[in-house]
Amino acid sequence: MTNDIIIIARHGKPELSRKVRLNWKEYREWWLKYQISGLKKEQKVPKRLKKWAEKSDIVISSSLLRAQESATLASGRDPDFIYEGLIEAPLPSPYLGSIKIRPKSWGTWSRIVWYFGWSDGMESHKSARIRADNMSNILADHSKGGKIIYVSGHGWFNRMLKGSLKKQGWKCKSQNGDLHWSYRRFERQTQKLVKNGN
């Protein structure tokens, strides 16, 4: 029996250095630069992920550059569809005075306060959840008819997509964490395509 398949991968290693210490304001400036940065040069896509991407029927990417470059590097072609709805959920750094820590630490603290409801004017957790539900519907529609869909996205929002897809009945058949080039592979029994007018 044929299955619809969605493979959701995190982008590769970005070019912007994380080897800095920043206060909360500087982290927000760093994040803005990160959002427009591309991939670090001369990196290899894991063999399994590259094989899946090359065999996919449709390649989809977030609208951010690092995701688009990752999609092309993995699949060998430009994305068929690019969605702003797949961008990473925001990271509003909490006001912690002059304390300076690494971007990774800021990311952790920012994600915690965001998760529990503090967004400081950025997209809220509730709104991002709705976005994830909407995007999971779009991805599911693309996969109908036994297609293999490769999606190049971002760490936390990929997790949110996992929850949305599971609510729809998708099964996560394999996954390997949340690091760069990590992935989650989802499958469901093939949904038939419905032609207009029938």
Where are these regions (language model features)?
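Short active-site-adjacent structural elements
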Residues: 16-17, 158-161
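Domain-level recognition of soluble alpha/beta enzyme cores
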Residues: 26, 169-194
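Signature for phosphate-centric chemistry
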Residues: 86-101
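Active-site-proximal alpha-helix that buttresses catalytic centers in soluble enzyme cores
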Residues: 2-86, 104-135, 187-189
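Generic beta-sheet signal
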Residues: 6, 57, 147-155
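Glycine-rich phosphate-binding loop signature in dinucleotide/nucleotide-binding domains
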Residues: 52-54, 139-147
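A short acidic (Asp/Glu
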Residues: 69-73, 160-165
